[in-house]
Amino acid sequence: MKKPALKYCGIRSLKDLQLAAESQADYLGFIFAESKRKVSPEDVKKWLNQVRVEKQVAGVFVNESIETMSRIAKSLKLDVIQLHGDEKPADAAALRKLTGCEIWKALHHQDNTTQEIARFKDNVDGFVIDSSVKGSRGGTGVAFSWECVPEYQQAAIGKRCFIAGGVNPDSITRLLKWQPEGIDLASGIEKNGQKDQNLMRLLEERMNRYVSISE
């Protein structure tokens, strides 16, 4: 199988960024919305000036104005803007045109998720499919029914499709059986609320081993 793209999200300190920058992740994510992992654009700019990051950088937003997202994206030179709220396809299209960034739409695993993928598909570059947990936009560490992964990827064909929720070193091989194109995680590589180098390495080792055996 092809190795999935890997995104480490919810980076919230200089130390987190230093560890993630040295990891095998392809994407690093910062959350600019209300969350226990929320960071300020000003702090992120300082950290990015101190750490050499040779990865794609994503900013996560929830129901933020297009003007604010565009300003932050340009200031931080974001590669990806991830929309995690109630944004509409027209918002994604406008943001894409204004910033030149890749636009990803986060969707929750629900009965209508494939229809939502179809609704957004022409206006975004990728999707993040996460668990549906009442009162939460993501970062819960709860997995959804991964047997739905092939269906979602088929619906999103031609676009990036990341799977989030409940991914950690112990569950990674179960997810890999469904051949996800991308994996997005935050709490699964954290210890005491901070990114943990040992958990990152363990997850990467298990993923690499599974992929090499499956080739």
Curated annotation (Swiss-Prot):
Reactions listed under catalytic activity: N-(5-phospho-beta-D-ribosyl)anthranilate = 1-(2-carboxyphenylamino)-1-deoxy-D-ribulose 5-phosphate
This protein's encoding gene: trpF
GO biological process assignments: L-tryptophan biosynthetic process
Gene3D superfamilies membership: Aldolase class I
GO function terms (MF aspect): phosphoribosylanthranilate isomerase activity
Family: Belongs to the TrpF family.
UniProt keyword annotations, A-Z: Amino-acid biosynthesis, Aromatic amino acid biosynthesis, Isomerase, Tryptophan biosynthesis
Disulfide bond entries: none
Pathways involved: Amino-acid biosynthesis; L-tryptophan biosynthesis; L-tryptophan from chorismate: step 3/5
EC identifiers of the protein: 5.3.1.24
Protein name, as recorded: N-(5'-phosphoribosyl)anthranilate isomerase
